[in-house]
From Swiss-Prot:
A GO BP entry: allantoin catabolic process
HAMAP family per the UniProt record, alphabetical: Ureidogly_lyase
Function: Catalyzes the catabolism of the allantoin degradation intermediate (S)-ureidoglycolate, generating urea and glyoxylate. Involved in the utilization of allantoin as nitrogen source.
Name of this protein: Ureidoglycolate lyase
Pathway note: Nitrogen metabolism; (S)-allantoin degradation
EC number of this enzyme: 4.3.2.3
Length: 170
């Protein structure tokens, strides 16, 4: 099994998979008579059908034991999905490019600094939310509508990956 290298989350590195939601380097301007800075259009909500709705939820995630064997990725073919950390804690992100099935050789891992969220583009393969803390909360913006919006792919055993935030130096 290949151990994924965990990369810092940057806009350029993550661009093939979606948007990094952060204030650094974002368009911004003052509103509310100069009392509020608006960081504008950090990501776009993508829904496939005209009757779909963008919805906001909160996910409360529990940590998984590490190192973690990555045996499954999911995708949302009908809309984008954004995760914004509410408690300021770093979290892990595992993604693979859009395609009929994810390719383990093209799968990448990132770590958010806790002030960054992500917006997965429609159809991007990703692991369900991976918190580093014992429990963490995320604001989630995604799609509600008819039709299936979650495909899961299970890797063959020889294609599985390992995510280890604390690899031993050898």
């Amino acid at each position: 099994m290949r151990t994924l290298t965990i990369e810092p989350l940057t806009k350029d590195a993550f661009a093939p998979f979606g948007d990094v939601i952060e204030t650094d380097g974002s368009d911004h301007f003052m509103i509310n008579n100069g009392s509020t800075m608006r960081f504008h259009r950090l990501a776009e909500v993508d829904t496939a059908q005209p009757d779909d709705k963008a919805i906001i939820s909160i996910f409360r995630a529990e940590s998984l034991p590490m190192p973690l064997t990555i045996g499954m990725l999911e995708r949302h073919p009908q809309g984008s999905q954004a995760f914004i950390p509410l408690l300021g804690n770093p979290f892990l992100i595992v993604v693979a490019p859009v395609g009929d099935a994810p390719e383990s050789a093209l799968t990448r891992a990132f770590v958010s600094n806790g002030r960054q969220g992500v917006n997965y583009h429609r159809g991007v393969w990703h692991h369900p939310v991976l918190t580093i803390e014992k429990q963490d909360d995320f604001l989630v913006v995604d799609r509600s509508g008819s039709g299936n919006n979650c495909d899961e792919h299970y890797f063959e055993e020889n294609q599985r990956l390992v995510l280890d935030p604390n690899p031993q130096e050898g």
